[in-house]
Amino acid sequence: MDKTRRLARGALLTALALGLSYMERFIPLQLLVPLPGIKLGLANVVTLFALYFLGSRTALQILWVRCLLGSLFGGGITAFFFSITGGLLALAVMVLARRLPFLSIYGVSVCGAAAHHVGQILVTVVLLRSGYVFAYLPFLLLVAIGTGFLTGAISAACFRAMIAADLPFTSNMEATYVGKIH
């Protein structure tokens, strides 16, 4: 793929991830799960897409730009540290989890959601200088199972649709990962 096409695809995916992240602010998830800081992680659908179809390097680039721009547009420096730490840890775990033959996209997504929460707890511990925050982690990990599964289900549905549409960048995906998507 040439540089211009790769850059355009990365910019489009970053914009999509930013849009999903912004849209997620309007979903009243606290009505269902009354815990502070809980989000669905819809932008992770884009990260999963990039990881599976375009590679970990592209996924990392999209993650960096999304976290940076998202913080500039509506979060500030503290939000950046929460977002980038959770995102980097989630991506690293998903890169490793994807290699496990028994994990589908659902499992990879749940692992990423759990890692994201761990990353955010680590930032909170540093900011508050208190280990008591770790008491909140079990609740976040339980939520990660649900949100990670939902994000994985959305990703799997999107992936199946893209493979069925026979998009050019999905040909390798079908041969390699189609069994692990379902």
Which residues does each predicted region cover?
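Generic transmembrane alpha-helix motif of multi-pass integral membrane proteins
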Residues: 40-56, 93-98
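Interfacial aromatic-anchored transmembrane helix boundaries in multi-pass membrane proteins
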Residues: 21-40, 65-95, 105, 125-137
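Alpha-helical transmembrane segments of multipass membrane proteins
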Residues: 17-21, 47, 90, 94, ...
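Hydrophobic side chains within alpha-helical segments
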Residues: 27, 42, 47, 69, ...
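Membrane-embedded alpha-helical hairpins and interfacial helices in multi-pass inner-membrane proteins
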Residues: 34-36, 76-81, 99-182
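Hydrophobic transmembrane alpha-helices
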Residues: 1-49
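Hydrophobic alpha-helical transmembrane segments
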Residues: 7-12, 45, 60-64, 80-85, ...
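Positively charged n-region of N-terminal signal peptides that target proteins for export
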Residues: 1-5, 57, 99
